[in-house]
Each structure stands twice: as C-alpha cells, then as structure tokens.
Amino acid sequence: MLPTYRGLGGLYNGATDDGVPIEVALSGPTLQRQPALCWKYLAEIGRACLRAEPNAGHFAIAEWQRQRPGTWLLTQNIDGFHRRAGSPPERLIEIHGELAPLSCMACGEVDRRPLASLLDEPLPPRCEVCAGVLRPAVVLFEEMLPERALARLQEQSRIGFDAVLVVGTTASFGYILEPIWRARQSGGLVVEVNLQPTDISPLANLSLQGRAADVLSHLLRHISSD
C-alpha cells in the first residue's frame, strides 16, 4: 500500500533522514542544486509505486467514469494507477504529473527506459544522449502546475459540479479546494472519504472514514443501484 502524502501515516509529516523537510528535499531548487539528494527521495517514491498496484478504489472510480460520461477525475497522485485502472484519459486531470517517462533537464530528450531499471543505477539517473540529469514530469515543491492540466481544471470549474467526491486528501492547495467550493455554492453534494477527519469534513454533506479501497467500491455500487 502506498503511503498518503499528508495526515495519518503520511510521507510529508516530518523531516527526512538528511535532516531537511521533505518539502525541501523534493523541491525544484534542490533538484537543480543537489540532484542526488532530491533523487534519493524521488527514488523512494518511485520504488514504492513500482511495488504497488491499482486497488479496488481505482477500479471503482474507473467503472463509475465509464457509466457516467460526465464524470471527471482530478488526482494529485503521480503513480499512474488511475490510467492503469481504466479511467478515460480525456477525463483525467493528473494535476501533479506522472513519474514516468523521465526527460533530460539539459537537452530535453525523453528517456523511454523502464523506470525500474533507471532506479537500479547510481542516482541521479543520467541522459543517454548528453549525460544530463533526468527528471520525472511531476510537480515538485516550488514549481508551477502544468499549464494544460490547470487549464482543463479551470474549464471544468467554470462549467460547475453537481457533486464532488473527495478521496484521501487534506486539500492543502486552493486548486484542490476549488471544486469543493464550487459544488457547495451551487447546492451540489460533497462526499468525503478519508482515514480521519480533515479540514474538508465541515464542508462535506457526508464524511466516510475508512480506506478508499474498502469504501469506494461499496459507495459507488450503492450509488449506481439508486
């Protein structure tokens, strides 16, 4: 099971083994100045993703999207599991990017080698063309969101939301809170699924505590039968 980013058992709850906050280690400036340090923790995330598989929650969301063509998925996850589970790419917004493939920070070459093989080599991984440092297409701390993903989110926000299902996030960023506020302002339904209460809980019409893999398949099956 992959750890959450914040909250109970979260990856970003403390300092790293190197004595710096994870937000510093996994930042754009650190990747530029100390690529080996940044890649130490990128590799930990990468290896955890490679060991894991999409769970029942991912498949339940994908099935719901197939049944309801107007349903969009906004995810902060960078593991690519929603694609693997079958969520339609045209209605999937990966706002923080995806771990693979890597590209060269110097020449821009896209590296198609498997991520697993690159993580087995000395870090940071290097470009086969120019020996520059490779990086994933993910949003590190202190970096801008990808323009295309942000534009798609803004377009859907302008259209509005009848209902928002918030799963496994503390919604620490304004762009994650935006759909929740939009739904609330228009009288829409907000349902939260999380291991523990969060700052979102007072905004939700219904808060369900539990693992997404356990809750989502039952919840969406119940909604589908109505």
What are these regions (language model features)?
Residues 1-226:
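Conserved catalytic core of sirtuin-type NAD+-dependent deacylases
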